[in-house]
């Protein structure tokens, strides 16, 4: 409406305008509206409530949050903290005590929780979490993340140690007016070190390396983090590659020429692109105008994205796909390189007028037949060489690592996860590679739609928890005691442990969860507190037998309770419980209470810290661990194997994605991600084989 109003006012004020300007204005507005109308698809799809409905953008506020990527947090761009910054403190009015300096977050609107289906929609104003004031800060902060191993990785990329970082005098305590009360010297990267990381990692390694993959060559398909033997760009010219990376002929075959991701273009596409770029830029006034159009396309989809993303090191996967638009732009210049070569050959053949004027005739208008024939022959050779040799070289190098024929590993391995689950079961997953293949198998192939896939990363959000209660095609909604009002508005995002007021007795799981959800006293400075982290789930063992979770002969060995100890869990030593942990415990306990009709599993690839201290109660049935009322028979705190179920699943239900087909070694391309999936299967097979050797009877409980 604002855009239309501004356009109407402008047209009214300028009553006499050329038709050309009116046409451009109307077409521009039309194109803008067509572009923005694509966002309507998100709202329409979300209102249909499909099984996969990320962020549930069914209203303007959640749509805004979705488009601004708020779930990924904020990244400092122009001014902000570094990885050496710490929180500032504010002096209290009494003049003695301090408190952490926090700034109130912005007010956001969220969809109100309905207490009945016929209640009208409402929107609630909520203040975002307080933002802690950090010190020291710097301009253009590139090294800011304190997560995991990021601080050490920053230092490695700038070839420095903690001692090499300079100290700056910075305020650490301020009064209510912002005046410095106390300052101290604190470490902070220098601006030179900051720029060194920016160019070494973000620009060179995370952009130009990918650029050179496409126009110079690639060492192998292994994800790298700066190593000389993983994922670098190469040219195929030994004098260049050996100087940069060491003697490439000494690499093991799987790291060098034996790796299908090993591609060499001898920099021919790069040279063609540079020639095309120069030809367009210096051709004429029209050429330079067109050059700037392509250049901004190249820059805004390449280096501008580098500036915006501000990527920390140790990325979980290669990010070359983020810059595909930039590579498309350079490919335009590669095509123009043919015309540039035509001009270059004309100049070399002694026809400078053609270079300047773009014509084949000299200025006097008289053509030299011999020279024209010679030029035409040379140009035919150049066109043939460029038009065939360079593309053929690229195709011959990249065909084998782009050919996916005969490879169905992603589909089949996703089905194998689902095949490990009993009917109507629940499987908890965590990462992309153990979630999206399962969703594909269910939604596209229609395979095992009775299984409910629960992604633990998404389960930290209220919109995903709400979706878990909704039935999908083939699977009923999940039952758990928490209601939308209990976890709405990030209320249970993180519940702290309070050792001083903690209940150390082991209580019923629903007593603990009810206290967390509803007890008004279970708070600390506005945040929820889990006061009862030691809990038990009644095993309901006889119902587990009827549901097929355990066998009749295993019933005498079943435990009366399944014990959970979240606090001081050695595999997850954190200071509180997440919403994901609370809801996953709730789901497991509820299905056990209701007769184990929806047995719970954890995908084999889920890290141990997500197991809720249930490891000794979990048995491998293929590619998933089933929660059962049986403890590990060897008395350890680790998972174990249900040999009966796993053997049946592996031998009767598993698929192998084409890897079981007869053919020459290397017929099917297996990139690093697929090879990791294959390794997961191999590990499962080895564990099963070892279990079968250890237990001579059909079941270890016999």
Give, region by region, the residue ranges found by the protein language model.
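ER/secretory pathway lumenal C-terminal domains and tails of membrane proteins involved
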Residues: 1-318, 322-323, 330-424, 439-697, ...
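Residues that form or flank phosphate/diphosphate-binding pockets in enzymes
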Residues: 436
């Amino acid at each position: 409406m604002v855009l239309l109003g501004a356009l109407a006012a402008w047209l009214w004020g300028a009553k006499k305008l050329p038709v050309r300007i009116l046409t451009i204005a109307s077409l521009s507005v039309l194109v803008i509206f067509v572009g923005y109308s694509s966002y309507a698809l998100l709202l329409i799809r979300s209102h249909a409530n499909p099984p996969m409905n990320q962020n549930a953008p069914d209203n303007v506020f959640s749509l805004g949050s979705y488009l601004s990527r708020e779930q990924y947090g904020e990244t400092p761009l122009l001014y902000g903290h570094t990885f050496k910054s710490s929180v500032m403190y504010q002096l209290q009015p009494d003049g003695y005590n301090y408190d952490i300096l926090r700034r109130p977050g912005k007010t956001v609107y969220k969809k109100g929780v309905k207490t009945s289906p016929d209640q009208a929609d409402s929107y609630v104003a909520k203040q975002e979490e307080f933002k802690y004031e950090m010190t020291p800060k710097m301009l253009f902060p590139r090294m800011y993340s304190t997560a995991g191993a990021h601080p050490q990785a920053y230092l490695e990329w700038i070839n420095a140690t903690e001692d090499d970082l300079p100290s700056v005098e910075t305020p650490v305590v301020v009064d209510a007016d912002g005046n410095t009360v106390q300052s101290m010297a604190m470490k902070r990267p220098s601006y030179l070190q900051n720029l060194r990381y920016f160019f070494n990692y973000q620009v060179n390694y995370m952009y130009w390396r990918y650029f050179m993959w496409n126009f110079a060559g690639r060492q192998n398909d292994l994800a790298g983090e700066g190593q000389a033997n993983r994922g670098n760009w190469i040219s195929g010219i030994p004098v260049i590659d050996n100087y940069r990376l060491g003697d490439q002929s000494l690499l093991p075959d799987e790291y060098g020429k034996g790796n299908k991701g090993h591609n060499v273009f001898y920099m021919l596409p790069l040279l063609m692109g540079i020639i095309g770029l120069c030809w367009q830029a210096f051709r004429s006034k029209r050429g330079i105008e067109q050059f700037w159009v392509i250049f901004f396309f190249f820059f805004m989809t390449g280096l501008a994205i580098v500036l915006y993303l501000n990527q920390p090191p140790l990325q979980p996967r290669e990010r070359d796909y983020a810059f595909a638009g930039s590579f498309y732009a350079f490919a335009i210049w590669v095509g123009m390189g043919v015309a540039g070569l035509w001009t270059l050959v004309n100049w070399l053949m002694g026809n400078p007028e053609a270079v300047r004027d773009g014509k084949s005739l000299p200025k006097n208008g008289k053509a030299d037949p011999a020279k024209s024939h010679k030029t035409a022959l040379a140009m035919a050779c150049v066109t043939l060489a460029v038009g065939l040799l360079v593309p053929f070289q690229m195709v011959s190098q990249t065909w084998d690592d782009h050919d996916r024929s005969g490879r169905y590993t992603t589909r089949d391995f996703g089905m194998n996860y689902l095949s490990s689950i009993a009917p109507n079961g629940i499987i908890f997953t965590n990462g992309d590679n153990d979630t999206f293949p399962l969703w594909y198998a269910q939604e596209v192939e229609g395979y095992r739609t009775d299984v409910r896939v629960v992604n633990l990363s998404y389960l930290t959000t209220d919109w995903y928890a709400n979706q878990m209660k909704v039935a999908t095609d083939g699977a009923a909604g999940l039952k758990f005691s928490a209601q939308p009002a209990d976890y709405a508005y990030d209320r249970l995002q993180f519940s702290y442990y309070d050792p001083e007021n903690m209940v150390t007795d082991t209580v019923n799981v629903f007593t603990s969860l009810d206290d967390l959800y509803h007890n008004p006293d279970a708070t600390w400075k506005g945040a929820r507190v889990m006061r009862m982290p030691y809990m038990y789930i009644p095993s309901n063992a006889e119902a587990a037998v009827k549901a097929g979770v355990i066998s009749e002969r295993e019933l005498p060995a079943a435990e009366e309770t399944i014990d959970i100890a979240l606090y001081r869990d050695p595999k997850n030593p954190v200071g509180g419980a997440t919403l994901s942990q609370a809801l996953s415990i709730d789901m497991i306990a509820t299905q056990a209470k209701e007769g184990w009709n929806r047995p719970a599993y954890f995908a084999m690839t889920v890290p141990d810290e997500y197991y809720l201290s249930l490891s000794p109660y979990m048995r491998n049935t293929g590619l998933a661990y089933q929660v059962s009322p049986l403890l590990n028979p060897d008395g350890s705190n680790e998972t174990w194997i249900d040999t009966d179920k796993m053997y049946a699943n592996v031998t009767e239900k598993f698929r192998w994605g084409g890897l079981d087909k007869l053919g020459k070694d290397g017929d099917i391309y297996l990139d690093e991600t697929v090879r990791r999936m294959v390794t997961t299967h191999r590990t499962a097979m080895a564990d099963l084989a070892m279990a079968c050797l250890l237990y001579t009877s059909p079941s270890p409980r016999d």
